């Protein structure tokens, strides 16, 4: 459909609230549906023309459309990723032989049979969802949304439209993924100074559900409420694993084909692009606390659980949490000592060999992330030069075209509050000897 027709369609769109209000990827309003590239392109045109309210309106609409596409992709790929139905297995090769070539031929047929089954499933699924009824956006545009670039324009558009509360939320949302972007940090401090907003009122519009639960668990941990802390930390861990699986599934969406290649190199190109997206899931889902990303986020949750369970006298869970942590940081001397301590007193607590094994979800996550990185390293090492594979690097973010002048920061409102949360602490056990802790009393 031509841009003019889409423009007429959007005349029907009422004033948008928060971009995710009343959202459903199954029942997305038909009057709000249009190509992501069209919505975003129009938003930037309005931005350049200083039509701030119209620009903000289309930027918010584009963010909703991006979420619609992301969630729809994840839904279909998750629902089509189950085990393949049984395929007839040839007893021998095409010439009746049973040698290695025949086995390779049979294995390849089964593999492509599974691929065809999955493709058919995806086609059926996507026919029913609104996101796939409009043209698919370019790859670079999706990367811009992943890096939260639209919020860099949105906060300034809201500011110029005199919507300071929304400007604060948009600027803060951008900084949560780009904490070192000094210009946006300056904007945010300026907005906060005008409204006298504290840290507790800042909202990340793209925050994942596990982030707030994790932060609450850490606060409870630091206050000594270990039981409530473990409950929240377990919930945060489970929610993170769910979001991580959804992110992996979403990486198998449509891909651009920019040139002609032989069959297997073409498949390798598509696979490498999907691999890069899946490896990036771990980074993109890492929470930002006070301007700093939580290093080894999953391992950190197991670290908190290990010490909290120990304080609750649940040594079996403490030992399993320690073993899970060691998957991600096997050289941590403190955790090594903790495991030695648990093993030394295993008879006292009735611990068995299986109590020193990593938890199932930790093992699965570790194996997934490790194998994905190994495969991606392989593509960089062996395929990029030989097959001229284009593994593009993420481009640096452009600045908004209309920066604030120095005069707009003069006088009242020029605040430089730090965003670092004072309560953030590492687990107390880290850096301490396990034997230095008092032994829990058995009841």
Swiss-Prot record:
Gene3D superfamilies found in the cross-reference section? Tetratricopeptide repeat domain
Keyword annotations for this protein, in alphabetical order, are: Endoplasmic reticulum, Glycoprotein, Signal
The reply to whether Cell inner membrane figures as a keyword in the UniProt entry is no
Q: State the GO CC annotations.
A: catalytic complex; endoplasmic reticulum; synaptonemal complex
Intrachain S-S bonds: none
Q: Which domain of life is it from?
A: Eukaryota
Any single biological process term in GO: collagen fibril organization
Q: Which residues are glycosylated?
A: 367
Quote the biased-composition stretches of kind Acidic residues, using this chain's numbering: 387-419, 434-443
What binding partners and quaternary form does the record give? Interacts with PLOD1, P3H3 and PPIB. Identified in a complex with PLOD1 and P3H3.
UniProt lists the family membership as follows:
Belongs to the leprecan family.
Official protein name in the record: Endoplasmic reticulum protein SC65
> What is the species listed in this Swiss-Prot or TrEMBL entry?
Mus musculus
> Which gene is transcribed and translated to give this protein?
P3h4
């Amino acid at each position: 459909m031509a841009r003019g027709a889409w423009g007429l369609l959007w005349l029907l769109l009422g004033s948008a609230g928060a971009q995710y209000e009343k959202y459903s990827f199954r029942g997305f309003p038909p009057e709000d549906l249009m190509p992501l590239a069209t919505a975003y392109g129009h938003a930037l045109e309005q931005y350049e023309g200083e039509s701030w309210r119209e620009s903000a309106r289309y930027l918010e609409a584009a963010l909703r459309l991006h979420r619609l596409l992301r969630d729809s992709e994840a839904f279909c790929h998750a629902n089509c990723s189950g085990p393949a139905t049984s395929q007839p297995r040839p007893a021998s090769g095409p010439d009746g032989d049973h040698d290695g070539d025949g086995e390779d031929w049979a294995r390849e047929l089964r593999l492509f049979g599974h691929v065809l089954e999955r493709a058919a499933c995806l086609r059926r699924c996507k026919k029913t969802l609104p996101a796939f009824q409009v043209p698919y956006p370019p790859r670079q545009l999706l990367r811009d949304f992943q890096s939260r670039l639209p919020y860099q324009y949105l906060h300034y558009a809201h500011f110029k439209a005199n919507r300071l509360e929304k400007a604060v939320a948009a600027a803060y949302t951008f900084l949560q993924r780009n904490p070192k972007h000094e210009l946006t940090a300056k904007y945010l401090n300026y907005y906060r100074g005008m409204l006298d907003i504290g840290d507790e009122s800042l909202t990340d519009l793209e925050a994942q559900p596990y982030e707030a639960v994790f932060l609450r668990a850490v606060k409870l941990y630091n206050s000594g409420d270990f039981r409530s802390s473990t409950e929240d930390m377990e919930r945060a861990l489970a929610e993170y694993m769910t979001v991580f699986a959804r992110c992996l599934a979403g990486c198998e969406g449509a891909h651009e084909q920019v040139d002609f290649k032989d069959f297997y190199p073409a498949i390798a190109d598509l696979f490498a692009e999907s691999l890069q997206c899946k490896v990036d899931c771990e980074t993109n889902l890492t929470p930002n606390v006070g301007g700093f990303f939580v290093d080894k986020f999953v391992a950190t949750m197991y670290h908190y659980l290990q010490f909290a369970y120990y304080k609750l006298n649940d040594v079996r869970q403490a030992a399993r949490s320690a073993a899970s942590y060691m998957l991600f940081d096997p050289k941590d001397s403190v955790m090594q000592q903790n495991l030695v301590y648990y093993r030394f007193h295993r008879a006292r607590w009735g611990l068995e060999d299986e109590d020193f094994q990593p938890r199932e979800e930790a093992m699965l996550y570790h194996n997934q992330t490790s194998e994905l990185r190994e495969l991606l390293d392989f593509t960089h090492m062996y395929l990029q030069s030989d097959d001229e594979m284009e593994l593009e690097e993420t481009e640096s973010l452009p600045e908004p075209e209309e920066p604030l002048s120095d005069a707009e920061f003069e006088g009242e409102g020029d605040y430089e509050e730090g965003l670092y949360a004072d309560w953030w602490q590492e687990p107390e056990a880290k850096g301490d000897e396990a034997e230095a802790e008092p032994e829990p009393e058995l009841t």
